[in-house]
Amino acid sequence: MPIATPLTELLGIRHPILSAPMDTIAGSRLTRAVSEAGGFGILGGGYGDRGRLETETAELKGFAPFGIGFITWSLAKQPELLDIALDARPQAIMLSFGDPAPFAPRIRASGARLICQVQSEEMARQALDAGAAILIAQGTEAGGHGASRTTVDIVPAIVDLAAERVPVVAAGGIADGRGLAAMMMLGASGVLIGTRFYASVEANGAQEAKERIRMANSNDTVRGVVADWSRSLFWPAPFTARTLVNDHIRRWTGREIELMQRAAEVGVEYAAAKAAGNFEVAAVFAGEAVGLIHDIPPAAEIVERIATEAEQLLTGRRNSVRGVLPSPLVGEGGA
């Protein structure tokens, strides 16, 4: 039986599993595949490539349910992109890394739910004041951009702050049903998953990048600024990017000031490497959950695996599941 939570009820989905809006990686194929499997796919709006956004949203018009996610500080530079997104009639718009207030009225007026990703209580209060319908509490284990607090710290803190006013979704270091079950025990209504879906058939990433995720372990990631500054992307504090370690990261870690001074030169090298698929220079944005990823299956299979394993844990079924929950807690499978 699917796990019912306030999140599944609010979004009308079978499983409390959302796929992260990973810039260009989370295209319409991945978004649709996750939603068709009973989760909630979120298209990546990224840094605001208008042409790509128009193409990807055109593929999703008339489809439901799905969401579209934006980097808030980048969207502020091209606010007209929100109109393109809303024209596709998504069920939700997800905003991360910035003040959602300037965009919240238009989102709510469209009928879409406002999802806000936060990394602190202050950000959560700001999101609630803006009318967020769902909060995503992101831990530092997450791939791509994030802050410094761990998932097991930030999730219950945001759950307590929300005080059941809105569902809270956990993000960061989650790749299987054990992660979903654990986050629900912390009070989350579901999970947002990125890296595990990056290593899926439908993700837009290069096959070499997916293979690097599959072969990596959790010690092979690092959080820092090298990948961003190599692209002349200077994110606001406190946000940094978690990537797989490669030759380029090793070369410039500890030399960030020099990197900033040589950003134009390094940027040419980085862009050429990305175009050539050279991932010893170009970054693979991935989280600490890489150590739990050992294959590259269809997204639907990932959703079903996670949902089934979590259900087994939360209902106390022991077949093929390790580390089951103590008996006083099983069978309460909601959040």
Q: Where are the predicted features?
A:
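Glycine-biased, low-complexity coil/linker segments
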Residues: 323, 331-333
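Active-site entrance/lid segments in N-terminal catalytic domains of soluble metabolic enzymes
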Residues: 1-167
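Conserved active-site-proximal phosphate/metal-binding subdomains
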Residues: 148-169, 175-322
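Residue-level detector of alpha-helix initiation sites
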Residues: 25, 174-175
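Conserved acidic functional residues
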Residues: 117, 172-173, 332
